[in-house]
A protein has these predicted regions:
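Small cysteine-rich, disulfide-bonded extracellular modules of the LU/uPAR three-finger superfamily
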Residues: 11-116, 123-163
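Short, Lys/Arg-enriched N-terminal segments with co-localized hydrophobic residues
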Residues: 1-15
Length: 163
């Protein structure tokens, strides 16, 4: 007599994900006047806040609910420092009914790093999050340049658009 043995195994799968989004907390903070991308008087200051971009591995969980920069699952490697690069902001402007701002491209020169996504955050305002970038897959550099090319700064393409 032939008997089949059924084996039941339970697996707990933890899936990390990076989902591109403008952070919800950032939207509320905009309405509260927390972030200053330009040099117009804000909070009694005429200097723009410092925006930074940090790279993260595929183990990171970043999405619209991300409220602040954290070193958890941040990329590491030659040519990369924790906290990432300081961004150069393109002056906020508008076209039609859409306000927008963007950033100049940024490069980690002669670097050896792998990243799945990035977080743009405001280091002037307690590292509050602005936006999450999802690269779609791991991107790497090996003793070369790792460059993030931002889209055209216009009402249809800028990385931060409010319509």
């Amino acid at each position: 007599m032939l008997t089949w043995l059924e084996l039941s195994v339970n697996y707990e799968v933890i899936i990390m994900a990076i989902t591109q989004a403008m952070c919800t907390s950032f939207k509320v903070e905009l309405l509260n006047g927390v972030h200053a991308f330009g040099t117009t008087v804000a909070r009694g200051s005429t200097t723009a806040d410092t925006m930074k971009i940090a790279l993260f591995t595929s183990s990171a969980t970043l999405d619209a609910t991300t409220t602040a920069y954290s070193t958890s699952n941040e990329t590491s490697g030659t040519g990369y420092s924790a906290g990432g690069n300081t961004l150069t902001t393109v002056a906020p402007t508008s076209s039609g009914t859409t306000a927008f701002t963007d950033f100049a491209d940024t490069t980690w020169s002669t670097s050896t790093i792998t990243a799945r996504g990035a977080l743009i955050y405001n280091s002037t305002q307690s590292d509050k999050s602005v936006a999450v970038l999802d690269f779609g897959s791991d991107k790497s550099s090996s003793a070369g340049d790792f460059t993030i090319v931002f889209p055209t700064a216009d009402a249809s393409n800028a990385i931060i658009r409010i319509a």
